[in-house]
Amino acid sequence: VVAALNGVSLQRITDRLMQFTGEVPMIVGGVSQTISSRSTFHSDLGIALSFIVEQYTAIGIKVRRVPYKVRGKTFENIEAEIPGTTNPEKVVLFGAHADATAGSPWALEAKTRGADDDGSGTIGCLELALAIKALKLPYTVRILHFTGEEQGLWGSYAYSDMIKKAGQELVDVVQIDMIAYCAKPGNRVDIHDSVDRNGSHATVVKFFRAIKRYNIQLTPVDTHNHAVDNRSDVAGFLDHGYRGVLISEEFSDDGFNPNYHTLGDRVKNCNLPYMVEVVKASIALAADLAGAP
């Protein structure tokens, strides 16, 4: 696990986040393209999703598109999976959302940035996947990139409904949303368990222990409140009885990102060394949840 944490690359995170937020071009389908918006209703979100798919394919991770319908329109989530070595039927799910808004989520927004919200979680999950693949863990780790989050958690509700209906059991659900803004000393990171809903506090304890065990440079805070209830993609899973938490930067106090849902949510306004630490903590947690010794 230590080697996996040391492999987290600030440069790779920076490069991908610059591409994913349209600051620089990305290569998708062999063509250089610059995305202008990740609005749920903008065609460029499709390019962004293809970028995610190609990143997984390039590192040899199985990935698929999972369509769902809202109001007669078809949208897609992206699902990547790293099979467990001994107990592949046990599944740990990590998630982030690929869509973004600059303040008018119901409009077809011509321009969004969404570096922190939730480019950070998206690119963080790609980095996590690379580490998890190398670790060869006993349990399966599945990574979801949801869409329609800014319209009311469309993609994650659809996906959680689908797997519950199929009788899929999950060890745990960890949503990573907004992990790249920290303007105060101390590197505070919040973990939300909706006040131990479905026994989710056990995951909070594991998160704290992982940070301490690997000397990760973060100050974790167990928010122990209902501030993010139904505001994050973990909501649908909690509704169905799964254990689940949200990992985020300081979300409910005075350290909140002032660029939230504006065109100012850009890479230059993010704290990427802080994000690296949160990604490391997420990898350490994933390893623990997926049966690492």
PLM features: residue spans?
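N-terminal capping segment at the start of a domain
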Residues: V1-D44, N215, G255-R266
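A non-catalytic alpha/beta surface segment that caps or lines the substrate-entry region
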Residues: D15, G22-P83, T219-V221
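Extracellular/periplasmic catalytic domains that process cell-envelope and extracellular macromolecules
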Residues: G7-I13, T57, R71-T74, P83-E89, ...
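Extracytoplasmic/secreted proteins, especially bacterial periplasmic and envelope-associated proteins
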Residues: A3, R12-Q19, S43-G60, S120-E127, ...
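Structural recognition of the beta-strand scaffold that forms the well-ordered cores
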Residues: R12-T21, R64-V66, N77-E81, V91-A96, ...
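Acidic/histidine-rich catalytic neighborhood of metal-dependent amide-processing enzymes
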Residues: T74-N77, L108-G199, N230
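Solvent-exposed loop/turn segments at secondary-structure junctions
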Residues: M26-I27, K62, Y68-K73, G84-N87, ...
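Active-site-adjacent substrate-binding region
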Residues: C182-P293
